[in-house]
Amino acid sequence: MVKHYAVTKPEVMLSRPAGPKKFALLEVEGHPCAQLLIAFTDSPDMEFCFFKDEKDGLWKLDWQQFARYQPQSWEDFVRGKGEGIGEFRVWMIRDRMSESRDDYAYRLIAPGMNGTNDRSIARPMVYVPKKSDMGKRLFMLFKMDEEMLHSPYKVLNANDDRGALRVRVLLSRSKEPNRKGEYSFTLVKLLGEGWYGLSAAK
């Protein structure tokens, strides 16, 4: 499966590091990991994730399992191109107007091609029944995020917009667009809280 990785602007590589900004150790699915946020002099902060290699015990920069990846271009997926289901790393923002309805409404925003300082142009909505297990779980995750208690991503979300929750989702797209040419989307599964995880979508 082709993986599209978020890339960094060329000028970032020419900018000098100003030093570590935040650092934290955590476990992802039982595997020791480290999150590092580094500030640069003339460019945006950069995120790094390291894992502890079980074979030699060394800490290594992880480019695959933990990096943001997607099976296809987010913009193409939202516009109806390619496979109709895929795993994505997104920010999820709750629509406050939906709190008085039967379903929660969430807007999904993917990182742009220049990393987390960029935002995707396409920002579809998904709807989740409040009384469903997923609806209850998302309610608790947003509540935890607001209270900043036991957040599963304490470091790398330092520069995120307030109220934007990082999640890994399995998303499906309708076969045909509506009269306006827009596709509808269904949140098939909430794969992870935060953007890092070893499990592949099944």
Please tell me what each predicted stretch does:
Residues 37, 42-101, 116-123, 168-201:
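Short beta-strand edge/turn micro-motifs at domain boundaries
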Residues 1-31, 111-123, 127:
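Short solvent-exposed beta->alpha transition segments
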Residues 21-24, 36-40:
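Hydrophobic transmembrane alpha-helix bundles
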Residues 101-143:
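OB-fold (S1/OB) nucleic-acid-binding surfaces
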Residues 80-87, 129-170:
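Short nucleic-acid-contacting surface segments enriched for D/E, G, S/T with interspersed K/R
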Residues 27-29, 41, 81, 160:
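Sterically constrained small-residue positions within well-ordered secondary structures
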Residues 25-33, 54, 99-104:
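Short, ordered beta-strand-loop transition motifs
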Residues 10-14, 23-27, 62-68, 83-87, ...:
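Short linear motifs at secondary-structure transitions and domain/linker junctions
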